[in-house]
Design a protein with these regions (language model features):
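A short, polar/proline- and glycine-enriched secondary-structure boundary/capping micro-motif
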Residues: 59-61, 147-150
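Vicinal oxygen chelate
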Residues: 4-83, 87-89, 94, 111-140, ...
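Long hydrophobic segments that form regular secondary structure
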Residues: 101-107
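Eukaryotic phosphotyrosine signaling hubs
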Residues: 2-3, 160
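Conserved secondary-structure micro-motifs at functional edges
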Residues: 138-149
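Short, flexible, solvent-exposed loop/turn segments with mixed acidic/basic and small polar residues
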Residues: 74-77, 150-155
């Protein structure tokens, strides 16, 4: 899980004070990754407000010492933005966290799913910030055997379960990750690829490259 996240804002102090005035809990303890205003978010994780970015420089310049062998501005492999980050919440808490983002930051709902499988089920509410750049699916299990429930037990609480990154060329980008030594999760069974044209008719994805 991720222990914190940071949002880029125009005025960090204003964003922090606004959130606290709406009921957010300010974080005033030790151990912050950045010396910027922060509130307590999902599962006790921190939500930082960062105003130093772009032409203003980087919020991390004064927090980390770059080593000689590290490049502070690496070329990267082709991932350019965060598409979304998912929260796993306890049963009955989805409305609580939906209200947290709605009341504090003006988020709106873009999708709602009630998925019932053969063995497990879940409810998912996808929400987005007013600017559309921050998307958060809130996931809540409907049984004791789901992946969400396993996460909550292993992590011992709610939290950020995964992040999804965006790219213009997913095959080239993932090939570069593999070349850099990243190990991927096991792929889906062969039937996933065999049935792909039935599920998504007319798709032109290169099946053999997908299998890699």
């Amino acid at each position: 899980c991720a222990p914190s996240m940071a949002w880029r804002v125009v005025d960090a102090d204003h964003a922090f004070k606004h959130a606290v005035s709406k009921g957010a809990t300010p974080y005033e303890g030790d151990g912050k990754a950045l010396d910027v205003p922060a509130i307590v978010g999902i599962g006790g994780s921190l939500l930082y407000f960062v105003e130093k970015y772009g032409d203003k420089g980087s919020a991390y310049e004064n927090e980390f010492e770059w080593l000689g062998e590290a490049n502070p501005k690496p070329e990267g492999v082709g991932f350019y933005f965060l598409d979304h980050l998912t929260h796993n919440v306890y049963r009955g808490n989805m409305d609580k966290w939906w209200a947290f983002y709605r009341e504090l930051f003006g988020f709106t709902q873009i999708h709602f799913f009630d998925i019932e499988g053969k063995l497990t089920g879940l409810v998912s509410r996808a929400i987005t910030s007013p600017c559309g750049k921050i998307r958060i699916p809130l996931n809540e299990s409907t049984d004791d055997k789901s992946q969400i429930e396993s996460y909550l037990k292993k992590y011992r609480g709610e939290g950020i379960q995964h992040i999804a990154v965006g790219t213009d060329g997913i095959y080239d980008a993932t090939d570069k990750l593999a070349a850099n030594g990243l190990k991927f999760m096991p792929g889906p069974p062969e039937t996933y690829y065999e049935m792909s044209h039935e599920r998504v008719q007319g798709h032109e994805e290169p099946i053999e490259r997908m299998k890699k």
